[in-house]
Structures are given as C-alpha cells and as structure tokens.
Amino acid sequence: MRFDPETFFAHYRLAFGPLGQYQVNGLSSMLAAAEADPSFTSVRQLGYAFTTVQRETNVGGVVNGRYVALTYNPITELGSYQYIMSHYQGRLDLGNTQPGDGWRFRGRGYVQITGRNNYTKFGRLLGVGLADDPDLALKPEVAWAILSLGMLKGLFTGKKLSDYIPLFPDEDSAMVG
C-alpha cells in the first residue's frame, strides 16, 4: 500500500488534533513500515494495527530521553522494578524461569511482548536475537515485524487479524490509490 503522508497527517489532525514531532516521527516510521510490508493488504486491518499501537503506546514512554504519552514509537513498559517483577517474575506461562527474567523480558515494542517465551519465539521467527538482546524490540523495523507477524498469524491471541476483520475482495483497493 502507498500513502501520501501530507494527506494522512492532515486527516489525522482533523480527527484527533495536533501532533508533537515525536508523534509525527513515530507515525512516519509506521507508515514507511506499512508501505514496505506486503503482508498488509487491507486498509481496515492496517487501521486496526495503527489503533493497537496507539493504545499500546498511549501509556507513555521515553523517546529520546524525554517522557511522552501517545508516542507511536516502540517503548519499554513503564513501571518500577518492583512492579514489573511482581507481575512477570516466575511466570511459567511466559517462560520466565531464571532469576531476573521478569525485568529482562518486560514489555517492549509497539505491542509490548513480554516473557522469555515470546522474545524467543519472535526472535526465532524473525531471525533476530531478541532473547539475547530484548532491546532489539525497540527498533521500529523489529517492532513492526513483531506486530505484523503476531497479528496476521495469530501469535498473540491464537486468532488471526482476519478472524476479526475479514478480507473482502476489491473493498480496500478502492480506498488506496
């Protein structure tokens, strides 16, 4: 899919109001990733992906050393060490079996993957050493690949995005020029 950034941002601002530069940068990165990703062929599904990122990054995060909310950038889950560890340490369902795994494998990215199992799984599928270096999930291209693969293949919930938002022939081709 191809997007006209000027048109996109004009419509975005009409619907949602002004954007900070860090938000423009984040959305621009997402638009570029979406254009380069042949997996997304539906504007409606892509809209859902963008909305998910908006929700997942709206809790705030640090971008270029500055705390911001609604970042549209890959972020590290916010929370104190104590909070994160109380929620993730020792969680067998996440594969957090080693001391410190709760903190090491806390949420990161556009969709906040958590747990040793998820970092290992996505790292293997993408050919990226996520289990060895979880901060790689903060790179926009890796964060997008996790989001795309997870949604389209059903790796987050067991259901594919098309189970929720089905693809219809010719519907979206009329929406994208």
Task: Please provide the spans of the model-predicted regions.
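Ordered core of a single globular domain
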Residues: 29-35
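Peptidoglycan-targeting cell-wall enzymes and recognition modules
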Residues: 2-29, 51-151
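Surface-exposed patches in mature extracellular/periplasmic domains of secreted proteins
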Residues: 36-49, 63-66, 157-170
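Short polybasic/polar patches that bind polyanions
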Residues: 35-36, 124
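Extracellular/periplasmic catalytic domains that process cell-envelope and extracellular macromolecules
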Residues: 4, 40-45, 103-106, 139, ...
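A residue-level signal for beta-strand positions that form part of recognition/binding surfaces
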Residues: 110, 158, 175
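Acidic helix/loop microenvironments that form the catalytic cleft of cell-wall polysaccharide enzymes
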Residues: 53-57, 162-177
